[in-house]
Amino acid sequence: MTVQVGQPAPNVPVQAYDRTKDGKDDQFRQIGLEDYKGKWVCLFFYPRDFTFVCPTEIVSFNDNLDEFEDRDCVVLTASTDSEYTHKGWCDSHEDLQKMRYPMLADTAHKLSEAFGVYDPEKGLAYRGVYLIDPNGIVRWIAVHDLGVGRNVDEVIRVLDALQTDKLCPCNWKPGEETLN
């Protein structure tokens, strides 16, 4: 069964490539969502390393990482590539050399299957993004087609709305009135 809004996020530990110290120090380690209990988590899946749309999203999340951190939210990304492929891609792509959040390696497809974005025919994950609250509950899901990149500003807007814990109308923005 795939995860739905209001359900606990599956904790499926996987290997990761973590290049978080000024883009210079790299390490391989295992990461699971349980590691981030007590924090908001933005987990986004992308189809494949060494492609065209994917780096635009990864770079945009990286460029906006301070916005997420200001909201006590960690960013994680995942694809079905290995942690070594992630490292090779980051090493060879100028913009990815500045990565400040971990890249999860879902080589067994268990994480993307648990979140309902794995396509077994193509062997990759759709562009799913999940906001998970500090209690480990999935609060928001968006899944895009393979060729359509996400809007990071919209992810941040939804995170802001969820953190108000109030009713937020259509097109609500931070600073505007809520409905309660």
Listing of model-derived features with the role each one plays in the protein:
Residues 1-180:
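Chalcogenol-based redox active-site neighborhoods
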